């Protein structure tokens, strides 16, 4: 390496943010892909939906970014944005649950780990729930469960299709049984939605695990997933220790689940809106003006 090349490399390193799978943790002008190592200009990465242009790795994005990808501009109307979790069990491990809630709220600007509302997608109505992994690992507590249940009930009344973007570590242990009962509550609401022959599509993103996978994430009429998303119930290590055998390298990935029939289609983030639009049209969803 020449002296000029060495200085150029050093200068470039000064502008490369922290290497992380979550680009939100990087504050530099440049971001290094955690999958292939390609360095990209942060602004270009964002304009490409936070998908690496070299290897198509899907970086984690927040709930607002998800909504902007799916919903028509300025069409999203949020519901139940005032609901906030409490600490009924006075749970404490190394820290109190109340402190963890406060930290997550201050760090994300969210009240809890999901945003719900009604929007349009290419002029067709859609009920939308988007989980946010930044808030306590996207864990499902009583507020998350209540907000998702309410938006499903709203969709059932209004005869709207619904999409739930899943990103979760599972049930929120700090709420105990109050968290676990959300699995049944949401599933019951979805059954009523299905009884009216309305369309429900979950989008499984990285990661979707635990009680979310064991309930509404797998109840869709069509189950969509992002490429290489981690999808499962228990962790890989737990399963290997239980079965006492080595699992395939691609076990619990979207591709593995597609091959084995648990996922219907893997959708690149850049094609998500057009894919959802096509599915809605095939299922006869009319636009807001009444046309097909």
Swiss-Prot record:
It catalyses: N(6)-carboxybiotinyl-L-lysyl-[protein] + acetyl-CoA = N(6)-biotinyl-L-lysyl-[protein] + malonyl-CoA. One of its GO terms (molecular function) is zinc ion binding. Its EC number is 2.1.3.15. It is an enzyme of class 2 (transferase). PROSITE patterns: COA_CT_NTER. A zinc finger (C4-type) spans 33-55. Pfam families: Carboxyl_trans, Zn_ribbon_ACC. One of its GO terms (biological process) is fatty acid biosynthetic process. Its main location: cytoplasm. It is found in: Cytoplasm. GO terms for cellular component: acetyl-CoA carboxylase complex. Pathway: Lipid metabolism; malonyl-CoA biosynthesis; malonyl-CoA from acetyl-CoA: step 1/1. Binds 1 zinc ion per subunit. InterPro entries: AcCoA_carboxyl_beta, Acetyl_CoA_COase_Trfase_b_su, ClpP/crotonase-like_dom_sf, COA_CT_N, Znf-ACC. Keywords: ATP-binding, Cytoplasm, Fatty acid biosynthesis, Fatty acid metabolism, Lipid biosynthesis, Lipid metabolism, Metal-binding, Nucleotide-binding, Transferase, Zinc, Zinc-finger. Zn(2+) binds at residues 33, 36, 52, 55. Belongs to the AccD/PCCB family. NCBIfam families: accD (TIGR00515). Acetyl-CoA carboxylase is a heterohexamer composed of biotin carboxyl carrier protein (AccB), biotin carboxylase (AccC) and two subunits each of ACCase subunit alpha (AccA) and ACCase subunit beta (AccD). This is Acetyl-coenzyme A carboxylase carboxyl transferase subunit beta. It comes from Prochlorococcus marinus (strain MIT 9515). The lineage of its organism: Bacteria, Bacillati, Cyanobacteriota, Cyanophyceae, Synechococcales.
């Amino acid at each position: 390496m020449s002296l000029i090349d060495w200085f150029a490399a050093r200068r470039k390193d000064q502008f490369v943010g922290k290497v992380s799978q979550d680009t939100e943790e990087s504050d530099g002008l440049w971001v290094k892909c955690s999958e292939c190592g390609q360095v990209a200009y942060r602004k270009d990465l964002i304009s490409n939906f936070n998908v690496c242009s070299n290897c198509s790795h899907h970086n984690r994005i927040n709930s607002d970014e998800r909504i902007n990808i799916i919903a028509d501009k300025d069409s999203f109307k949020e519901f139940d944005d005032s609901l906030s979790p409490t600490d009924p069990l006075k749970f404490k491990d190394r820290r109190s649950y109340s402190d963890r809630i406060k930290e997550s709220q201050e760090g994300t600007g969210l009240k809890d780990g999901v945003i719900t509302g009604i929007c349009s997608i290419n002029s067709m109505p859609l009920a939308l729930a988007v989980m946010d992994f930044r808030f306590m690992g996207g864990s499902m507590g009583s507020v998350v469960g209540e907000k998702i249940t309410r938006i499903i009930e709203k969709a059932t009344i209004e005869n709207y299709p619904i999409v739930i973007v899943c990103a979760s570590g599972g049930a929120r242990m700090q709420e105990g049984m109050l968290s676990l009962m959300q699995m049944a509550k949401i599933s019951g609401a979805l059954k009523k939605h299905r009884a009216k022959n309305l369309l429900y599509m979950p989008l499984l993103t990285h990661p979707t695990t635990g009680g979310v996978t064991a309930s509404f994430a797998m109840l869709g009429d069509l189950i969509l997933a992002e490429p290489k998303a981690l999808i499962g119930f228990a962790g890989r290590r737990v399963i290997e220790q239980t079965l006492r055998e080595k699992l395939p390298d691609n076990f619990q990935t979207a591709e593995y689940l597609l091959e084995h029939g648990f996922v219907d289609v893997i959708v690149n983030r850049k094609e998500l809106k057009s894919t959802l639009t096509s599915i809605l049209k095939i299922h006869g969803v009319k636009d807001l003006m009444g046309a097909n």
